[in-house]
Amino acid sequence: MSEHAAAASKRPDEYVPWREFLTSGYTASLALVSLGVWLHAADSLVVATMLPAMIADIGGAAFVSWTVSIYEIGSIVAGAASALITMRYGLRGPMSIAAFLFGAGCAASAISPNMGLLLIGRALQGFGGGGLVAMCFVALGVLFPRRYAARALAVVSAFWGMSAFLGPLIGGLFVEYANWRLGFWFFAMLSFMLSAWIALRQETATLEQGKIGTRFPLSRLALLCLAVVLISYGGVRVEALRTSALIGAGVLCLIWFFRRDGLAGPDRLLPHAPLDPRHATGATLLMLMMLPMATVAITAYGPLLMTVVHGTSALTAGYVVACSSIGWTLAAVSVSGSPERFDRIWIAIGMAVTTLSIAGFVYAVPAGPVWLIAVCALAEGGGFGLAYTFILRRITAVAPEEDMQRITGAIPTMQRIGYALGAAYIGIIANASGFLSIQTPDDAGTVARILFLACLPLAVVGLVAMLGLVRRHPYDASL
């Protein structure tokens, strides 16, 4: 047995030193997965930074919100289909195509003379990026021994966290010293290089033996697409009747999608009982949908509320919100070597800390001081980092073998569905609490208090769902 194989075959409940992990022979696979995730994470922030220059050049200000929404729609739909695609065709081909689609979308945006072609490019970026990230999570569960899964996910989390800083920096540099079109060409070049790298790597072919001969579920994907479009559009311009109707219709479509998918047998896109907390897989996905729903308020409304209530600059408010990414990265890197027998504890502590951070926002955002808001943001991200690092390893240990790729691919997809639902939900709450009629810091403080209080029930549902993942399982007796 080789040295690398011997290390990987050690008991997964032993501590994993960074030195062992980084010299284990999985470095190239780790770099590939990390780059795929970073491209997807950084792209949105780069585009947000370049957006004013893009609008000044090609116009289309009325469609600004759709540059984000259409990307998210593509990401969610492609992410949902990724598990089934990898089960049929393996990892190498689909991942390479997803990276190529992402690059093609960037190229289309780079040459766009108007907003129409740019939106087509954003749709391609969404389909490519969403599929790429979901397949990267499948790769984490398949290409790495479970002993190394937490370390691998910690590195991916670090790259995701770095995107919070490097994304706006890259976008700003292109706008300041070149032009926004070169920014898209930069990402296109990286994507095409990644596509070629994936296609030429033999190790990623290890999944190509699990093919299944099923029809591709276009009707279910169309239903999911419709659900996300309705929910996203409902949150773009918040009006009580219009928004409630659109989001209600979107949620009904989402429920219909889940029901139809559950009856599809081996053709399922998602694992069995995807939102049933009585099953470990359902508990995991429900938790990963509800907690992002509960935490999106600080990103969406935090900067504006801080500038009104506390008079902070936009830059300071942005750094406060970025503390969430810092907390996530630091926590993930710090604890990822923990033995597997502590996974349940870290998941429970992490999600509890995230929930407590929301309670902290209820006080800190309206009352201050600003450093306390930053501490709460650090705790929110840190809680996610503590838990998220071990969720993949935990669920791959207790989930049914036939659902392994479905659950790993569904993790980022359900997160994005949660963010979409959460953005629409807090949009309604903000509108109902007087956000549009804010005139004084006291008014803004009242809105902030209501917003974060309304997020607490969502977090509690996520905590209850978490119990289905961390409760004792027969597998735990082997640790």
Model segments located where?
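Cytosolic juxtamembrane N-terminal segment immediately preceding the first transmembrane helix
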Residues: 1-42
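Hydrophobic alpha-helical transmembrane segments
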Residues: 12-18, 44, 69-71, 98-106, ...
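12-transmembrane solute porter fold
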Residues: 26-42, 47-49, 59-62, 67-70, ...
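Alpha-helical transmembrane segments
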Residues: 31-34, 100, 220-228, 352
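Glycine/proline-centered helix-kink
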Residues: 48, 134, 155, 160-172, ...
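Helix-loop-helix hairpins in multi-pass membrane proteins, especially solute transporters
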Residues: 82-215
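Alpha-helical transmembrane segments of multipass membrane proteins
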Residues: 107-108, 173, 229, 233, ...
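Hydrophobic transmembrane-helix bundles of small-molecule transporters
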Residues: 176-286
